């Protein structure tokens, strides 16, 4: 792809215009039509960061419309708030967007609560071995309760989120 303005790289264009891209995913740039479908797109890299969380939040909000166990109404902020600090080092596959606080101060996340409800496990909003094992089982992966970095389970999870496949 060649841009008429040589001072603006494709990467910078996609990064700076992704927020304001029209619904069609196109932006008129001078006389050139530029598409930005992959700007900030989720990739299946095996690390659960903010992009994975945003896609999960979107899916849980959609699922809430047909599954009364899931509350929905989640902000699309890519954040998993107030998680047990003891789970951080045990799960190196959980990266950006995770707020780790002391175990006695952790109050949980609404996103994790909805995920837990959807998986059919106790909904305290805290990621831990039980929730991770349930997610791994649903994904058809070894249920060891740990998300390594990179994690094969997170890769499968990301692929399901990308494809919209929840079966």
Enumerate the language-model features and the residues they cover.
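Cell-envelope/ECM-targeting effectors and their regulatory/trafficking segments
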Residues: 2-167
């Amino acid at each position: 792809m060649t841009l008429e303005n040589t001072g603006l790289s494709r990467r910078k264009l996609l990064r700076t215009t992704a927020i304001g891209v029209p619904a069609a995913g196109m932006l008129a740039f001078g006389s050139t039509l530029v598409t930005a479908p992959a700007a900030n797109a989720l990739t299946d890299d095996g690390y659960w960061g903010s992009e994975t969380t945003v896609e999960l939040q979107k899916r849980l909000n959609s699922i809430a419309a047909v599954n009364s166990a899931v509350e929905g109404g989640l902000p699309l902020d890519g954040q998993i708030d107030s998680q047990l600090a003891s789970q951080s080092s045990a799960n190196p596959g959980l990266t950006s967007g995770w707020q780790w606080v002391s175990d006695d101060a952790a109050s949980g996340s609404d996103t994790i609560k909805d995920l837990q409800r959807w998986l059919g496990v106790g909904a305290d909003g805290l990621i831990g071995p039980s929730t991770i094992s349930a997610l791994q089982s649903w994904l058809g992966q070894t249920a060891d309760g740990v998300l390594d970095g990179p994690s094969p389970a997170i890769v499968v999870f990301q692929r399901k989120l990308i494809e919209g496949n929840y079966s």
